Regions:
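Active-site helix of classical SDR
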Residues: 112, 148
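Substrate-binding pocket helix/loop in short-chain dehydrogenase/reductase
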Residues: 88-89, 96-98
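Residue(s) in the substrate-gating loop at a strand-loop-helix junction
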Residues: 132
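SDR active-site lid
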Residues: 165-237
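A glycine-rich helix->loop->beta "capping" turn
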Residues: 66-79, 85
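The beta1-alpha1 cofactor-binding region of Rossmann-like NAD(H)/NADP(H)-dependent oxidoreductases
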Residues: 52-62, 94
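Conserved glycine-rich cofactor-binding loop
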Residues: 11-12
Length: 273
C-alpha cells in the first residue's frame, strides 16, 4: 500500500520539488497551498491539491482531517510553509512581526497539533519541519526570521522526546541557501531599500548585496527535497539533517571558531565590518 505525505507550502521551491519527488517515488501526496491555481504538479495522478492558509487554525484542522480521510491515513507530515522578512527590527510593524510568527512558527504548531491524534492512533508517523541553517546561526537584519527558525528548531527537539513513546519520529531539515524565488516572491522588507533617510539603509543595502552575490553557492530545491525524502524514509531516530554544502560548511566553521571570531567573520561577509 502506498504511503502518504502531507506537505504545506507547495506553490514553489522546496515544497513543489518535494511534491514531485514523493509522487515520482510512488507516494500519495496531499499538497497544500494558499491558492490551488498556483499548483504546478496537477499532472501527477497520486497528488491531491488542497487550499490551505496555515495561519487559519480552523482550516488547518479541517484540511488535515480531510486528507487523512481521502487517503486512508497520513504517514509523513512535512511542515514547509514559510517566508522571510529582511530589514532592521526597529522598522518592523506589529503586523509584520505577527505574520512572520503566524506563518513560520504558529502554522507549524497548528498543523502538528491537528495531525498528532491521527498519528498517535496508528502508533507511527514522521513529522519533518523545514527550518534553515538560520535556525542554528544568525545573519544581520534577519532577526524576525531567525527568531521563528530558532524557535522551530527547539520545538522540534523537545517534540522528538515526547512523541517517541508513540512511535512518531520528529525530523528537522535545515537548508542553507536555496536557488528559488524565495528571495523575491517570498521575501518581505521592513524598510524600503531606496529610503536614504533610514538610519539602517547602509546595512540594508550591504546585506542584500551579500545575499545576491552568494547565489551561485546555493542548492537547488530538488537537492533539498532529496534530503527531505531521506529524512522521511531512513527509519532512523536522527533529529537534524543539514541540507546543502554551504550549510554544512558554515556550521562546521562556527564549531571551529570562537564566538567572537565567527561573528566578526559574518560581519565582514555581509560588508558590515
Amino acid at each position: 500500500m502506498s504511503q502518504t505525505v502531507f506537505i504545506t507550502g507547495t506553490s514553489m521551491g522546496i515544497g513543489a520539488a518535494a511534491v514531485r519527488l514523493f509522487a515520482q517515488r510512488g507516494w500519495n501526496v496531499a499538497a497544500t497551498l494558499r491558492n490551488p491555481a498556483d499548483a504546478t504538479f496537477t499532472d501527477l495522478p497520486t497528488v491531491r491539491v488542497y487550499a490551505l492558509d496555515v495561519t487559519d487554525e480552523a482550516a488547518v484542522m479541517r484540511v488535515v482531517q480531510q486528507a487523512h480521510q481521502d487517503f486512508g491515513g497520513l504517514d509523513v507530515i512535512l511542515n514547509n510553509a514559510g517566508y522571510g522578512i529582511v530589514g532592521p527590527f526597529e522598522s518592523a510593524t506589529d503586523a509584520q512581526v505577527q505574520q512572520q510568527f503566524a506563518t513560520n512558527l504558529f502554522g507549524v504548531f497548528s498543523v502538528t497539533r491537528a495531525a498528532l491524534p491521527l498519528l498517535r492512533a496508528q502508533q507511527s508517523g514522521v513529522i519533518i519541519n523545514v527550518t534553515s541553517v538560520g535556525g542554528r546561526t544568525a545573519f544581520p537584519l534577519n532577526s524576525l526570521y531567525h527568531a521563528t527558525k530558532f524557535g522551530l528548531d527547539g520545538f522540534s527537539e523537545a517534540l522528538w522526546y515526547e512523541l517517541a513513546p508513540f512511535g512518531i519520529r520528529v525530523k528537522v531539515v535545515a537548508p542553507g541557501g536555496v536557488a528559488t524565488d524565495f528571495a523575491t516572491r517570498s521575501l518581505q522588507m521592513t524598510v524600503d531599500p531606496a529610503d536614504d533617510a533610514n538610519p539602517y539603509i547602509g546595512q540594508v543595502r550591504s546585506v542584500l548585496d551579500a545575499f545576491s552575490s552568494h547565489g551561485g553557492t546555493y542548492s537547488s530545491a530538488e537537492q533539498i527535497a532529496e534530503v527531505i525524502y531521506t529524512a522521511a524514509t531512513d527509519d532512523s531516530a536522527q533529529l537534524r539533517y543539514l541540507a546543502g554544502a554551504d550549510a554544512q560548511q558554515l556550521l562546521q566553521t562556527k564549531a571551529e571558531m570562537s564566538e567572537q571570531d565567527f561573528m566578526s567573520m559574518i560581519r565582514q561577509n555581509f560588508g558590515l565590518a
